[in-house]
Amino acid sequence: MWQGRFGYREGIFIIYGLAFVGLLLQVIAGPIPATAFAYPFNLVGGSLLLAGILFWGIFHRRAIRRNSARFSFLSGHIATLTSIGGLLLLAVIMGLTKQIPAEMGRGLQHPIHRLGLSSMLSAWYFLLLYLYLLFVLGCVTTDRLMRLKLNLRDGAFVMNHVGLFIALFFGLMSSADIRQYRMQVYSDSDYPEWRGIDQRTKKMVELPVAIELKKFEIAEYPPKLMIIRNNSGKALPYSRPAHLSIDRTPSKGTIDRWQIEVLAHLPYSAAVVTKDSVVFREFRSLGAVHSARVRAANLDFPQEVVSGWVSSGSHVFPYRSLRLTDSLSLVMAEPDPKQYSSQVYLYAENGEIDSATILVNKPLRYRGWYIYQLSYNREQGRWSTMSELELVKDDWLYGVYTGIGLLLIGAAMLFLGPIPASTQAKREDHD
């Protein structure tokens, strides 16, 4: 071992050594602090990594001239496979272990938390193996660049490896530099909101962009009718609760041996107390609820017929159910949101004002920030006057995109490139 050309034993030993050092650091120092490798420390570390690869390339080139294989291990397939295998093993463990933020695991004495298995991305051994894989990838790419031939296959190899290196390198650089803030804006506020809560420090900070909520809107799925037990509130049947969606009127359906007929549906309504009953009338103002006039007939006992109004309720008006028997009631569940969005005004530091609509799952790109529609006041529902947004900025993101672009170019070059001679010969022999 450690004599002559390095083999798999040496490669695996390096992985074990890095993992052992990482475990010691994890036990002694705890997880990696969130800001430990933020700017400018990530810039210094990244520069040292690139300098190490450059110096390796210089010494490797000198060794080649002297017909020496002293530095060839790091650009060989053994180092590549063992470095990938070590990091892949950690990825499998991470997939099988519930991951929590490193801050939540501090002070917990269970070995899973003490060893960092529950917060793998903040573990020292993960960082060391990631850096080793990145260094090996850089050495492999440098070695190929020194032996580059002007053909499509070599070009594809370089594009793929350079692209992967750039994507992984800038992904590492940005991991501690991503800025995430949560901001709550209100439509009834007279002033825009400049402050956000830093998701790492949990402190309120002023941001270079302000947001004013003009209007919050929700598109909902049709409300659903269900039959529940009065004493437990559980929907029937217990094994697989059924419901009737009010997507049109009139409509009918069967729930647990009750035929339900929807005679009318008012998406915006309020209860009106008459002389002998409660009815619903159209009401397009704050707190308006979905309501439906229904008729329910027991299929086992046709003489049991009940009719009346049901509503989902809101933060202003209580829900209303229809009692079918002493133990059963027909209720309307709150409609599920289909899409929600915020119409906002955006204020920049230089005084410029813009307007935009932020949709859920469709972030808004604004002056280097990604603004996500995160949540709203669930209690108020579609009448929510509050919208919760998340503002994210990653200054290294374009580097990751560049790496992905080079990977795609390399894949296209491989696809369009000529068939290797050995493969072509095999096809001809087969024919």
Predicted regions: what is each one?
Residues 1-431:
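Solvent-exposed, non-transmembrane regions of integral membrane proteins
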